């Protein structure tokens, strides 16, 4: 259930 968190982080900070 870490995919959800990773997915959100990937779309919320794509500039990093």
Swiss-Prot record:
Superkingdom of this protein's organism: Eukaryota
Name of the featured protein: Protein SP1
């Amino acid at each position: 259930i870490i995919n959800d968190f990773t997915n959100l982080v990937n779309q919320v900070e794509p500039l990093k």
